[in-house]
Regions:
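Acidic, PIN/NYN-like endoribonuclease modules and their adjacent C-terminal/linker elements
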Residues: 1, 104-134
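Short, well-structured N-terminal submotif of metal-dependent ribonuclease cores
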Residues: 1-37, 44-63, 120
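Structural motif
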Residues: 18, 28, 69-70, 126
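Residues at the C-termini of beta-strands that transition into short coil/loop
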Residues: 36-37, 75, 134
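Active-site neighborhoods of divalent-metal-dependent phosphate/nucleic-acid chemistry enzymes
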Residues: 44-47, 56, 68-117
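Short, hinge-like loop/turn segments at secondary-structure boundaries
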Residues: 50-53, 89-90, 132-134
Length: 134
């Protein structure tokens, strides 16, 4: 089983002294992935930075992440999974954020766990394996 790393975990790496490559390389049995959704969220943070030095630092971090992790795209299997998940959550009145629903759908479609500190949202998704970060 592989693992999809949510932007909440990547932001933890950006703000701490913890090394992303060490974390990824320490997961010998499973490959780590970045979703195209999380890539967009990280790049959004770069564009939102008001200060040039903060922007440059964020961009360097994001480019490092993009170089370190294979990017999982939204494919037809994910779209099918997402449509089913969306319908299920809506019927149960347990909707989660749009970005998070796509991440969860990708995990379900590809047999991945998700590493996240946003457990409240993802715990609403039946069958989703979550690696909780504090």
């Amino acid at each position: 089983m592989g693992i999809l790393i949510d932007s909440s975990v990547l932001i933890h790496f950006e703000r701490s002294d913890t090394d992303l490559r060490t974390y990824v390389e320490g997961r010998e049995e499973e490959e780590a992935f970045l979703s195209v959704i999380s890539a967009s969220e990280l790049l959004h943070g770069v564009h939102r930075a008001g200060d040039k030095s903060i922007k440059a630092k964020r961009l360097a971090f994001v480019e490092g992440v993009l170089a370190a992790l294979p990017v999982l795209v939204i494919d037809l299997a994910t779209a099918r999974s997402h449509s089913q998940l969306w319908a299920d959550l809506a019927q149960r009145g347990k909707m989660i954020g749009v970005h998070d629903s796509w991440l969860a759908a990708a995990c379900l479609a590809h047999g991945l766990r998700i590493a996240t500190s946003n457990c409240r949202e993802f715990e609403r998704v039946p069958g989703l394996d979550i690696e909780k970060w504090e």
